[in-house]
Amino acid sequence: MSIASVASVFKGEHAVGSQVTVRGWVRTRRDSKAGISFLAVYDGSCFDPIQGVLPNSLANYNDDVLKLTAGCSVVMTGEVVASPGAGQAFELQVTEIVVTGFVDDPDTYPMSAKRHSIEHLRELAHLRPRTNIIGAVARVRNCLSQAIHRFYHQEGFIWVSTPLITASDCEGAGEMFRVSTLDMENLPRTAEGKVDYDKDFFGKESFLTVSGQLNAETYACALSKVYTFGPTFRAENSNTTRHLAEFWMVEPEVAFATLDDAAELAEKMLKFAFSAVLEERMDDLNFFNERVDKTVIERLQAFVSSDFAQVDYTDAVEILKNCGKKFEFAVEWGIDLQSEHERYLAEEHFKAPVVVKNYPKDIKAFYMRLNDDGKTVAAMDVLAPGIGEIIGGAQREERLDVLDARLAEMDLSQEDYWWYRDLRRYGTVPHSGFGLGFERLVSYVTGVNNIRDVIPFPRAPRSASF
């Protein structure tokens, strides 16, 4: 007797006539007048549940089977047979069923068979993986994650685990969560009356990281090609569909690489990841295409087969100013492009993914390489039809004198970045990288447009339950 996942049965890995045991949870139960019950049982291995056919001759039919409701957990053993009904190739003729857990008071079970709004499900984050939509999101998220690791492994990258606790602000934005063990009711003070962080756990002011990039650069400048993939944190008080306080980032860094090299890597990575989802998770994509966004599959297929367009920021501004479209936010050189501008470029002008390069230095971070014009930096954003910016990257400033000047311009302390400056003092090299917000990627692939629904336990302003 073999333990079988529902997915393995549907893939034909167990011959018709073989005996298998399937373990999972009841989605629905239907009883026929002929004394047969039909259970739809899922185990999370694929989108569709398997149908178990249970005759009333089972020893516990009256005591257990007829009491089964949505959410009950069961272990079914039986024979794999070809399904006479439409919708699935195989079902299970059950010869034994063990109920491992009933649902207390089925009438109040929050995940009953009726459809719930996705907003309501956010309040039940511990139970929402049991729904079709969140289960499908979880499988797609896993597929994308595995594909990204596979891609970088095949490309010869080394995965580096960067710290979550840091004293550096990569973005220079200041929107960071403080990490402290000080007694909030009795804070130690300096002679000037400021909080004395010398008495804190790390002996200095410390924060949750906003990016693993700076740390990854140190390893790229020794191991050539590295990437990080982990959680990052922003104390940005934004209650929008696009913002989380805790989210995951994919951040590759490559030594001896230019901005164009980074753009090429980004295109290659995205196409690899999307191809993996199209190949491995079509059952879930069909659900999203039918219930969430009817363009999901077509959009991914078009993305994979598209050549990326490239345009300088300065030229992009001219395109937007002369397109004849009225935008909510006016366009002029020196502004950061808004989502509406990004989407116009990708969806209406280029009708393809587009890399916008060479942004004004005043709207970009201190570590981005200053171009020869003295006004722009070697930065890029990858814009995707349907969502806008999906990746942000840059060639890093490898010249110590220029880096120091940028730190001074932005009122950042050389002392705080002494170790980052050392990379420019000891065998400096041109190097480039980018950051991909992983939840934004999952949102793009699934069509689920609220970022809080594509991460298991969303963290946002006034939201830290579970």
Swiss-Prot record:
<keyword id="KW-0436">Ligase</keyword>
<dbReference type="GO" id="GO:0005524">
    <property type="term" value="F:ATP binding"/>
</dbReference>
<comment type="subunit">
    <text>Homodimer.</text>
</comment>
<dbReference type="InterPro" id="IPR012340">
    <property type="entry name" value="NA-bd_OB-fold"/>
</dbReference>
<keyword id="KW-0963">Cytoplasm</keyword>
<dbReference type="InterPro" id="IPR002312">
    <property type="entry name" value="Asp/Asn-tRNA-synth_IIb"/>
</dbReference>
<keyword id="KW-0030">Aminoacyl-tRNA synthetase</keyword>
<dbReference type="InterPro" id="IPR006195">
    <property type="entry name" value="aa-tRNA-synth_II"/>
</dbReference>
<keyword id="KW-0648">Protein biosynthesis</keyword>
<dbReference type="InterPro" id="IPR004365">
    <property type="entry name" value="NA-bd_OB_tRNA"/>
</dbReference>
<dbReference type="GO" id="GO:0005737">
    <property type="term" value="C:cytoplasm"/>
</dbReference>
<protein>
    <recommendedName>
        <fullName>Asparagine--tRNA ligase</fullName>
        <ecNumber>6.1.1.22</ecNumber>
    </recommendedName>
</protein>
<dbReference type="GO" id="GO:0003676">
    <property type="term" value="F:nucleic acid binding"/>
</dbReference>
<comment type="similarity">
    <text>Belongs to the class-II aminoacyl-tRNA synthetase family.</text>
</comment>
<dbReference type="Pfam" id="PF00152">
    <property type="entry name" value="tRNA-synt_2"/>
</dbReference>
<dbReference type="InterPro" id="IPR004522">
    <property type="entry name" value="Asn-tRNA-ligase"/>
</dbReference>
<keyword id="KW-0547">Nucleotide-binding</keyword>
<dbReference type="GO" id="GO:0006421">
    <property type="term" value="P:asparaginyl-tRNA aminoacylation"/>
</dbReference>
<dbReference type="InterPro" id="IPR004364">
    <property type="entry name" value="Aa-tRNA-synt_II"/>
</dbReference>
<dbReference type="GO" id="GO:0004816">
    <property type="term" value="F:asparagine-tRNA ligase activity"/>
</dbReference>
<keyword id="KW-0067">ATP-binding</keyword>
<dbReference type="Pfam" id="PF01336">
    <property type="entry name" value="tRNA_anti-codon"/>
</dbReference>
<dbReference type="InterPro" id="IPR045864">
    <property type="entry name" value="aa-tRNA-synth_II/BPL/LPL"/>
</dbReference>
